[in-house]
């Protein structure tokens, strides 16, 4: 089944009188959409109660939920501390997507920065292995540019 829906709430969502993300599922279902991406782009900041309510609404209206992990994930960073933070962001996103009733995390695995594309790619592959050892029970949906990176990440579902 193909899932289709927005990332976050659009201007038309608010123009229709909605105020909270919990209302998105009914609104989307009425529009014939069946997916919703909750964004943690600037941080993982949803409490357990809100996640519980959103999960109930998602299930009630048959709208599948995913999350977008923080934008500052970068498995091509040369700092071990920053790699550990990237792993932590994905791990915490996995915990939250499960609380929300979903099973997919969308994230951008790396950026080139001041390296060559080849250097960034090799570093990303090496550091991404740290994430794979966690055995997360979610599906990783990488937002990637470039064929080489795409071919590499297409083989991973965790």
Where are these regions (language model features)?
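Active-site acidic/histidine proton-transfer and metal-coordination neighborhood
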Residues: 76-158
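N-terminal pre-domain/capping segments
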Residues: 1-69, 73-92
């Amino acid at each position: 089944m193909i899932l289709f829906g927005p990332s976050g709430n659009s201007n038309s969502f608010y123009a229709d009188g909605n105020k909270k993300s919990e209302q998105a599922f009914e609104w989307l279902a009425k529009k014939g959409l069946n997916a919703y991406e909750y964004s943690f782009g600037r941080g993982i900041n949803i409490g357990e109660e809100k996640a519980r309510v959103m999960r109930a609404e998602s299930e009630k209206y048959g709208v599948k939920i995913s999350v977008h992990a923080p934008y500052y994930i970068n498995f091509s960073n040369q700092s071990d501390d920053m790699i550990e933070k990237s792993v932590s962001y994905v791990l915490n996103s996995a915990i939250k997507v499960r609380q929300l009733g979903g099973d997919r995390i969308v994230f951008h695995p790396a950026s080139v920065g001041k390296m060559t594309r080849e250097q960034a790619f090799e570093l990303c592959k090496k550091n991404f292995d740290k994430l794979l050892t966690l055995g997360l029970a979610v599906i990783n949906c990488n937002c990637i540019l470039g064929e080489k990176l795409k071919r590499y990440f297409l083989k991973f579902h965790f």
